[in-house]
UniProtKB/Swiss-Prot annotation:
Belongs to the L-aspartate dehydrogenase family. This is L-aspartate dehydrogenase 1. The active site is at 211. It catalyses: L-aspartate + NADP(+) + H2O = oxaloacetate + NH4(+) + NADPH + H(+); L-aspartate + NAD(+) + H2O = oxaloacetate + NH4(+) + NADH + H(+). InterPro entries: Asp/hSer_DH_NAD-bd, Asp_DH, Asp_DH_prok, L-Asp_DH, NAD(P)-bd_dom_sf. The lineage of its organism: Bacteria, Pseudomonadati, Pseudomonadota, Betaproteobacteria, Burkholderiales. It comes from Bordetella parapertussis (strain 12822 / ATCC BAA-587 / NCTC 13253). Keywords: NAD, NADP, Oxidoreductase, Pyridine nucleotide biosynthesis. PANTHER family: ASPARTATE DEHYDROGENASE DOMAIN-CONTAINING PROTEIN, L-ASPARTATE DEHYDROGENASE-RELATED. The gene is nadX1. Disulfide bonds: none annotated. Specifically catalyzes the NAD or NADP-dependent dehydrogenation of L-aspartate to iminoaspartate.
Length: 258
């Protein structure tokens, strides 16, 4: 296929640039038509930047990838979908807001667009979605990270080592908005934000983000584990997250939200 895939991006940070690098190395030509940022004059890197969603959509992207956080997703996603453009959100945790999720699904259905949920930092998301049709009774996500990966994004003290949080996926997204997007993906693929259990652990000796997914039900059970290296010291995201966003933008390896 020689026609370039036209991709827009919300955000222009470490994650966005890492994903753009993966897209640039694909066999199919990909054109990054622009990044939506608050101040184009301060944007770093070689990607073209725009200061409004109208300017970005004027570049006729076929798909837009959000890499700018939950607030940006809430602000721009509905307009993107209403324009008939598919959306790949990195900030899946924002979809714990039932009203927002409903509004985005309504906009997508009306315009014939899709919300492509990436697999993020975890393997086994497709298996969890398949198991849901058979019957899933319990889902647990357990994340183990170095203190800096969690402390910079929350207010209040955290333990030096051990269990920092235990609760539902909905509670985890509220507590760790920068770190709990994977829990959103797991909740949407499986049994929802309230029934999905989450444990966040701190390990000062950790050199990677360790993600574990455990599920049990009428299908049987499984345990998946990923030890993901971070993109950089300044980013909490694992390198594989950028790859999953690129894969979803290219049209495969994603969960279609419905």
């Amino acid at each position: 296929m020689n026609t370039p895939l036209r991709v827009g991006i919300v955000g222009c940070g470490v994650l966005a640039n890492a994903m753009a690098g993966h897209l640039a190395r694909q066999p199919r030509p990909v054109e990054i038509v622009g990044c939506l940022v608050r101040d184009p004059g301060r944007a770093r890197g070689a990607l073209p930047c725009h200061g409004s969603w109208e300017a970005l959509l004027a570049q006729r992207p076929e798909v837009v990838v959000e890499c700018a956080g939950q607030a940006a997703l809430a602000q721009y996603a509905q307009a993107i979908l209403a324009a008939g453009v598919d959306l790949v959100p990195a900030s899946v945790g924002a979809l714990a807001d039932d009203a927002l999720r409903g509004a985005l699904l309504e906009a997508a259905a009306a315009a014939g667009a899709r919300i492509r949920i990436p697999s993020g930092a975890m393997v086994g998301i497709d298996g969890l979605a398949a198991a849901r049709h058979v019957g899933v009774a319990e889902v647990l996500y357990r994340g183990t990270m170095p203190p800096v990966a969690l402390q910079r994004y929350v207010s209040g003290p955290l333990p030096e080592r051990g269990l920092a949080f235990a609760g539902s996926a909905r509670e985890a997204v509220a507590r760790f908005p920068k770190n709990a997007n994977l829990t959103g993906t797991i909740a949407l693929a499986g049994i929802g934000f309230d029934r999905t259990r989450v444990e966040m652990l701190i390990d000062p000796d950790a050199t990677a983000n360790v993600h574990e997914l455990l599920a049990r039900g009428e299908f049987g059970d499984f345990h998946a584990r990923v030890s993901g290296l971070r993109i950089s010291e300044s980013s909490p995201s694992s390198r594989i997250v950028a790859g999953s966003l690129a894969q979803a933008a290219l049209g495969s390896g994603f969960l279609a939200l419905s």
